[in-house]
């Protein structure tokens, strides 16, 4: 279930030589990952509380499932997997998308009568935002709808640092909808989270929203599922706002021929021990045509390189969603990048991990051995070999862009 990536073609003796290793943790496809879970189909949002397992939103099965990961890639899960149902509505698209956790005991209290704060909150394509806490039950319980916005299609969700405001990306309206700690709509002013002109001119709308350290990153994509799945380089952008919705100076990152953003959704800031891309802004492309992770200098927005995602033998890439680093308990390692992917055209699912591993003599020998297998299905400008066996290892060399 592991796939090593060269971070860049360099001598194995170079001080910064490293390999990025992908580990498939959970999939609905038997044999593709360490754990098989049929609920994990088109997984979107991921969140966790300190020490908790990962909570993963599964759009295609209207569920959230829990996976405990320790030591970066060790999945320790009961069978069956703990599952929470996300409520559906009678009409419109369905399924949970973005997800956040809440640790503020005074915020986001459920209105089902128990008046306890939500532990986890879910946005949905059906225009609802639902919430869950243990008072609703354990395995098999159902989250409670707290927000219903007619006509909305919520494709992403974020919470501010104080856990007192929610931000929801509304694909149908092209807006960021804001809610207070009582789940009531908030008007931050006409210009708050307004799509920058150079992004609006491209016909792009908010696709996801992520709060990282008090900076709110909004990713933009073409409106509508078909346009998003077929987006190419240039069909995407990122804008950085304050938590009050003010665009930050130099806060716009546009896609283009040398900035390969294609319907981007997931965003993360790499820690200082993540190899070549340490400290970089990582942006994941959802597009089926360019489903990959692109790294940028967080200050200059200079494009630094790409990490491809290996979807598995026989599976098509496409549908890359969350990027997040772990928390240090049952929520993985802070040095490991975790991702969700609706592989095979969002008909299946993958929850995986990417680590930066020093390119020691042993790993260099492994890389050389695997490289000898050739690359029958590699995309242009990359060097991708088939896996050594059905589920074990692959070599994906990060493309070198001009």
Segments predicted by a language model, with ranges:
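Sequence/structural signature of beta-propeller domains
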Residues: 2-393, 401
């Amino acid at each position: 279930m592991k796939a090593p990536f060269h971070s860049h073609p360099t001598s194995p003796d170079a001080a910064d030589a490293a390999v990025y290793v992908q580990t498939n943790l959970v999939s609905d496809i038997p044999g593709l990952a360490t754990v098989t879970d049929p609920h994990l189909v088109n997984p979107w949002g991921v969140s966790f509380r300190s020490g908790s397992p990962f909570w993963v939103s599964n759009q295609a099965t209207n569920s959230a499932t829990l996976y405990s990961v320790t030591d970066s890639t060790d999945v320790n899960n009961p069978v069956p997997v703990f599952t929470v149902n996300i409520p559906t509505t009678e009409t419109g698209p369905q399924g949970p998308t973005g997800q956040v956790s809440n640790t503020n005991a005074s915020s986001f209290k459920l209105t089902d009568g128990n008046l306890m704060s939500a532990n986890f909150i879910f946005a949905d394509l059906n225009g609802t935002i639902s919430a869950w806490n243990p008072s609703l039950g354990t395995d098999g319980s159902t989250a409670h709808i707290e927000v219903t916005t007619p006509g909305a299609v919520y494709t992403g969700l974020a919470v501010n640092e104080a856990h007192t405001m929610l931000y929801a990306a509304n694909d149908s309206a092209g807006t960021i909808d804001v809610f207070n700690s009582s789940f009531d709509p908030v008007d931050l002013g006409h210009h708050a989270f307004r799509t920058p002109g150079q992004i609006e001119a491209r016909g792009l709308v908010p696709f996801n929203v992520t709060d990282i350290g008090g900076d709110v990153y909004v990713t933009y994509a073409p409106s509508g599922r078909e346009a998003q799945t077929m987006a190419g380089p240039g069909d995407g952008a990122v804008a950085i706002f304050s938590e009050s919705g003010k665009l930050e100076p130099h806060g716009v990152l546009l896609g283009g021929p040398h900035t390969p953003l294609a319907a981007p959704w997931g965003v993360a800031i790499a820690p200082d021990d993540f190899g070549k891309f340490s400290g970089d802004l990582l942006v994941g492309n959802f597009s089926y045509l360019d489903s990959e992770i692109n790294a940028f200098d967080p200050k200059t927005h200079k494009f630094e390189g790409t990490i491809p995602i290996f979807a598995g033998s026989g599976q098509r890439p496409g549908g890359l969603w969350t990027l997040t680093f772990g928390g240090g308990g049952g929520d993985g390692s802070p040095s490991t990048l975790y991702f969700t992917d609706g592989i095979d055209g969002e008909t299946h699912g993958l929850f995986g991990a990417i680590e930066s591993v020093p390119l020691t003599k042993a790993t260099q020998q492994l890389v050389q051995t695997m490289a000898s297998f050739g690359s029958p299905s590699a995309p242009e400008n990359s060097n991708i070999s088939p896996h050594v066996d059905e589920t074990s290892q692959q070599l994906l060399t990060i493309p070198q862009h001009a």
